[in-house]
């Protein structure tokens, strides 16, 4: 019988053919565009974390809410929670100290300095994939233990801040003196889509350290925070783990001393859990049944909790006082001889063969066991460089305490950006180089000063292209992930930024602006650089027949070279900046994907990216002065010509060579080459979503809207690092 007959029979009996079971017809189900075209451009990355997903609304002010928080009472509640053991997840030795330290560590430990993504700044541990990573087993329980406290204090404390504060309080409760705590992490309400966790399709796929150097991700295996605790690819070899440890900790900006301090400090308290084989462990939170209510890894072994708990599969307790701070980690590491053994779950670990039974059992006070260590713990003894640091910490516990306090603070605050973003009563006074410190303001330019400065810039002989280009070069280093970079500080005038190929315009323009700054002495160089962009855009808009005042907020300062970590700032150098038609390497993704990546780092929406590219092309801001994408006969005029000519069917585009990176636009009738373009230009005509946006600005009635939209997006970029205005 035909499908038509089936449908007819269904209708004749009064039944709806769409309610008869079979295929999933719910929203979002079925074969999607990316199933057909897996390399489809991810324009959707520019739409994440919008107000549509935020239940608190766009008027919510976290800093204002936090100011209402009884901070002391909150810390008191956290301290009480540490020893309030719950039967559904009993605390080891009656304390959740180790669990909460691990929760905070694993929240912050996803940060990587190469692109500033990951980290604890958004509370992403609540969402997939992190909530279900193999390395985060049982942290769902830690978050549930915190829920009554989050419920009590509501929006006065974000989940993101609470996770880290809980780790700090756990350390303090163990007798350790922390370096401080800065709040200010605002929650988001959906998973980050922009973080590249790697290409692997299976959990715990091994990555060689050399591969990590080429693609500096945060871990040596998919689903781990750092390294495999059993050694690379379960090798069980402490020495072979050294390269992996350096690679992963180095990728988040940690040196050898910080690395040793963090590993030892983190393993001074608590334990690992491996009561039985992983086959007893159920589905992770994302795959668990609906009745599990977001909890995962249910264990069928014994009670499944307490002494029967299975987390990593390792069963290690490092110190004699696992709920109190000590130097026992280093004492045990060097005092005893270690032999390889296996946990009850079969995982490779080491036991102190010549040690007495001095380690307390977490649930039976009458029992003791020998000290145990992870494979990667022993790396700190057998790697020559790590060993020197470890012995120093063994002999100088105060040096260890100081190193761990600072390294822990760095670990948990590295992705927060400048100190200006920190709030709360425990923010340390000391400025740290990794915070990209800035001096106090020297200038407070008046409105009259600004008017005079604009006139001086306009009379300086700089072109519109030069003025706009230098402002973009200064501001566009900003990264939304870790809030680094931006125009404040005028680091464009310092090493390493002044020497970047993409910033070639700085060599021509900065001497002019620096001379002007010294002559007038009314504003910082940082403000003058941004003001130059204002002058250039206002001139370009006027040339297009639109009178507009570009908003400008003074108050930027000029950083010193000694306040600038050259190595860390080198990571901000773009491998591509499609807004300036710049690309340094052809072996990393596609040009158009890198444009999306750059726009996402600048927190731009797809319309904002579109209008900025179109405007910057007609203003002639290509890094090398090329004519690629300059689809206009009147450069320097803020017109919609880029869009109108890109979408004009009079022109046919063809690649100039097999690389498919450069293209010529020829007149279909004459064959004459009219324009040249890169992939960062043509994508606005080829991608269906971006073409739809380009069509808006190509319409005959779009000119004034285009100028206003361009100015709004431009000002947004210029002020991305103005946390004093937010």
Swiss-Prot record:
Q: What's a GO biological-process term for it?
A: hydrogen peroxide catabolic process
Q: Which Gene3D superfamilies match?
A: 1.10.520.10, Peroxidase, domain 2 (1.10.420.10)
Q: Where is this site: Transition state stabilizer?
A: 102
Q: What is its EC number?
A: 1.11.1.21
- Region span, Disordered: 1-33
Superkingdom of the source species: Bacteria
Segments passing through the bilayer: none
Q: Known InterPro entries for this protein?
A: Catalase_peroxidase, Haem_peroxidase, Haem_peroxidase_sf, Peroxidases_AS, Peroxidases_heam-ligand_BS
Q: Where is this cross-link: Tryptophyl-tyrosyl-methioninium (Tyr-Met) (with W-105)?
A: 226-252
The UniProt keywords, alphabetically, are:
Heme, Hydrogen peroxide, Iron, Metal-binding, Oxidoreductase, Peroxidase
Family of this protein: Belongs to the peroxidase family. Peroxidase/catalase subfamily.
Q: What is this protein called?
A: Catalase-peroxidase
Give the organism, scientific name.
Salmonella choleraesuis (strain SC-B67)
Gene symbol here is katG
